[in-house]
From Swiss-Prot:
One of its GO terms (molecular function) is toxin activity. Belongs to the scoloptoxin-06 family. Keywords: Disulfide bond, Secreted, Signal, Toxin. The keyword Secreted applies. It comes from the Eukaryota. Residues 1-23 form the signal peptide. Contains 2 disulfide bonds. GO terms for cellular component: extracellular region. This is U-scoloptoxin(06)-Sm1a. It comes from Scolopendra morsitans (Tanzanian blue ringleg centipede). It is found in: Secreted. The keyword Secreted applies. Expressed by the venom gland.
């Protein structure tokens, strides 16, 4: 097989591959379907809600751990500038 025949075969095979790809366009094109963008937006809102819930959980865990550490300490004076849950503030803080 001479070099011209070899390059001709490669050219035909590549054209067939391109033709196959053109026959089946990508179904994952987000710019074509606005419902996909709505789904992405909803996912972002869900992630923000999860982040907010996680932050609240961390604050509550922090206040519970401080409460457990200082459960026997009657003279404990909490820092009123810290973020504690309402139950903790009522029980342990004098922030009036």
């Amino acid at each position: 097989m001479n070099s011209f025949s070899f390059f001709l075969v490669i050219f035909v095979v590549l054209n067939l591959q391109v033709a196959k790809l053109m026959a089946f366009p990508a179904s994952e094109d987000l710019s074509q379907d606005p419902r996909d963008m709505d789904q992405i937006t909803n996912t972002v809102f869900d992630l923000r809600a999860l982040q907010s819930a996680l932050q609240k959980s961390q604050v509550n865990t922090k206040s519970r751990s401080k409460r457990l550490e200082n459960d026997d300490d009657d003279d404990f004076d909490c820092d009123c500038d810290e973020e504690y849950d309402d139950e903790y503030i009522e029980e342990y803080c004098d922030c009036d």
